[in-house]
Amino acid sequence: MPSKKVLQTEHINTTDEAPKTTSVRPRKRKADVAIHLQDPDEEVTEMTRKKQCASQACWNPDTGYTSPCRRIPTPDEVEEPVAFGSVGFTQYASESIFITPTRSTPLPALCWASKDEVWNNLLGKDKLYLRDTRVMERHPNLQPKMRAILLDWLMEVCEVYKLHRETFYLGQDYFDRFMATQENVLKTTLQLIGISCLFIAAKMEEIYPPKVHQFAYVTDGACTEDDILSMEIIIMKELNWSLSPLTPVAWLNIYMQMAYLKETAEVLTAQYPQATFVQIAELLDLCILDVRSLEFSYSLLAASALFHFSSLELVIKVSGLKWCDLEECVRWMVPFAMSIREAGSSALKTFKGIAADDMHNIQTHVPYLEWLGKVHSYQLVDIESSQRSPVPTGVLTPPPSSEKPESTIS
C-alpha cells in the first residue's frame, strides 16, 4: 500500500471544485453522552420489527380460512385499543420497569434525559457490538502484522483528508467485524476492504465526507470507484446495517468529560485539555494496531488508557469499573504506554479549515508501526510492586484531575 499517493493528495485540486476559501467550516462537536438520541441502532431494530410484524399480518392460506372473500388486514388500519381486563390478560399487567445500570453511572443529573437510561444505553453498545478475538484464525493467508499495516495506513489517509478520530475508529470497527463474518480472505483484497470501511465511516460521521474517487485515488490504482461501491454494499449487509458502535475514542471522550466537568450545563461541550486528550488517544491508536486489542471491550480499552495517564481512583470514578475489571487490560497495555513515553509527547497539530476547538478530534498519524516494533522489547512491569494505587512504573502520569491543567502535560 504505497503512501506516496496519500502524501500527494494534499496538493491536488480538481478544476471542477469551487475555489478555496480561508473561512473555517463550523464543525462543532458535542460529547458522546447524547448518543442515545436518534440512535441509528434503534431505528434499524424498529424497521426490522415493523417488517416482521407486517409479514405476520399477511393472509396465511394454511389457517383454515379458504374463502377468497376473507378480509386481509392492511398496515393503514388503526384498531381500537383493547383493555387487558376485558380479554382476560390482567395477570400479565405490570408496573413500569426501571432499568438499573450494570455499572454505577458517572453522569451528572441531566435536564433532557435520565442519566441512568443514558448510561445504560452506552453500556449496551459494548454488549451489542461484539468482535471475534480469534478472527485471524479464519484467514490463514493473513498475518496480524498485515492488519496493523492496513490500520496504520488508514490513519494516514484520515490525516490527509482531515477526518475525525471517530471516523477512523468506526472504520476499524467495521473492518474487524466484517472480517469475522468471512473466511480465507486474500491479502490482495485487504486494502479494498479497509478503504471501503473508511468510506462508509466517513459518510456516517463526517459533515463533509470525501468523495468515492478520493478514496480510490489514495490506493494508487489498486481499487477503483466501482470496487469500493460494490464492497460497500457487501460490508453493510454482512454487518446487518449495524453501524453505530461506541468506539474507544468515544468512550475516552466521555471519561475525560466526566473527569474535567465543572458545570452540569456544559456537559455536551468538551471541558478537558486538548493536549491531554491527544496523548491518551495516541496510546489507544497504538494499542488498536495489536490484534490482542480485540480481547477487550471498547469501554475497557479507553479506561485502561486513561489509567496510564491518571490514577485508579479517577478511572473508577469516571467509568464505574473496578480494579478487577481493569487489571488484565492495564497489564497488557503497559508496554504500549512505555513505547509512547520513549517516543515523547506529540504536539497538537493544526489543520487549515478546522476550528481551533476541534483540532484534537482530527485523526493524526505518527510512526505507529515503529513504536509497535518496540512494544515487544519491553518487559511487563510488576504492578503489585509499584504502589498501592497501582500505576505501572515508567508510565506517563499527569497532575491530578482536580488541578484541571490547561497546558500541555510534560
From Swiss-Prot:
It is found in: Nucleus. GO terms for cellular component: cyclin E1-CDK2 complex; cytoplasm; microtubule organizing center; nucleus. It comes from the Eukaryota. Gene3D superfamilies: Cyclin-like (1.10.472.10). GO terms for biological process: cell division; G1/S transition of mitotic cell cycle; positive regulation of G1/S transition of mitotic cell cycle. CDD domains: CYCLIN_CCNE1_rpt1. Interacts with CDK2 protein kinase to form a serine/threonine kinase holoenzyme complex. The cyclin subunit imparts substrate specificity to the complex. This is G1/S-specific cyclin-E1. It comes from Danio rerio (Zebrafish). The gene is ccne1.
